[in-house]
Curated annotation (Swiss-Prot):
Pfam families: GcpE (PF04551). PANTHER family: 4-HYDROXY-3-METHYLBUT-2-EN-1-YL DIPHOSPHATE SYNTHASE, 4-HYDROXY-3-METHYLBUT-2-EN-1-YL DIPHOSPHATE SYNTHASE (FERREDOXIN), CHLOROPLASTIC. Its EC number is 1.17.7.3. The keyword Ribosomal protein does not apply. Binds 1 [4Fe-4S] cluster. It catalyses: (2E)-4-hydroxy-3-methylbut-2-enyl diphosphate + oxidized [flavodoxin] + H2O + 2 H(+) = 2-C-methyl-D-erythritol 2,4-cyclic diphosphate + reduced [flavodoxin]. It comes from the Bacteria. The keyword 4Fe-4S applies. This is 4-hydroxy-3-methylbut-2-en-1-yl diphosphate synthase (flavodoxin). [4Fe-4S] cluster binds at C304, C307, C350, E357. It comes from Aromatoleum aromaticum (strain DSM 19018 / LMG 30748 / EbN1) (Azoarcus sp. (strain EbN1)). One of its GO terms (molecular function) is 4-hydroxy-3-methylbut-2-enyl-diphosphate synthase activity (flavodoxin). GO terms for biological process: isopentenyl diphosphate biosynthetic process, methylerythritol 4-phosphate pathway; terpenoid biosynthetic process.
Amino acid sequence: MATNSSSGSLVRHKTRQVRVGRISIGSNAPVVVQSMTNTDTVDVLGTAMQVAELARAGSELVRITVNNEAAAKAVPHIRDRLLALNVDVPLVGDFHYNGHKLLSEHPACAEALAKLRINPGNVGAGAKRDPQFAAIVDIACRHDKPVRIGVNWGSLDPSVLARVMDQNAKLAQPRDANAVMREALVVSALESAAKAEEYGLGGDRIILSAKVSSVQDLIAVYRDLAARCDYPLHLGLTEAGMGSKGIVASTAALAVLLQEGIGDTIRISLTPEPNGSRAQEVVVAQEILQTMGLRAFTPMVIACPGCGRTTSTFFQELASGIQSYVRDQMPVWREQYDGVENMTVAVMGCVVNGPGESKHANIGISLPGTGETPAAPVFVDGEKTVTLRGDNIGTEFKAIVDDYVATRYVKKAG
């Protein structure tokens, strides 16, 4: 089933709604952005600071590793440290292998978390699997916590894979190995969800994911999951990689699914550059959703790519400067003004498309190209208002942007 979205003709896949702390996931709720820390959870201050960085960048949920007793003991202290920093973002505990033990022995950890993530592929093997899975579900029920059942092709339950392979071998036309793997992922997720409900977890407390690192496989898996269940779905290309490769791969996969209305929360699993900001994955997730018209997080800065008419570096510097300025100002603007995230700002490099593109934005500036008159007309809501000249064009244009925000958007009460 599907529901209409406010974004053009896009139709959202109809799912249940799951509450995670103060955040709603699924049904008609906006697609939620989430992220994950890469700190040692035992480092309370370091983890809290990175969670705060991710939350301030716009992450609406942040996942942290809980892999041993020291990490489990640290979780409540991380929560307290965040509240002292005035950061109230829901924390998701990431459990593998020993989650049943850690949660049983450290109930304060379970209480401090807003959601539990468990992997059916490593919750336990053989006769231990079901009791250990049941133990985590029981803890989730007692603490009223939702659960993401997260299947991953790198840790797929071997018993499920073997069963699906046996079934495939009996078909008149057996499927290829990739199709078998995809089916095993879907079966593992759905059977685990059914078992969680059997153990007492409400259907409105379950989110599913089934991650792979191939774009085409991810699209196929989630199409299948969406067709076979109404649980909210967490999208993400696992191990997407670094830099532009990771961004392009994640965007290629998620954009297709989101356009089909599939996906209720997303995470971009980028490998950060050495000494790079972990928050880049949050920015990329926001930009995917905003570019597709699904969410609005920050004013959009439109800029042309430049050509032989724009040989001056000033155009590039101004476009970059305005992009950074808008993003830096957004935390303040968001607190003060309603709707400012919908603003568009155009920074264009020459007379060919500059004036026309600038007129379509809320605010636009058309810089002179090579050989053009050294003047930069500014357009506000489609009307030319002023022409800037000289060495202070960037500073003057930022002041115009500030004035537009202050005069066009409604100031919030209080």
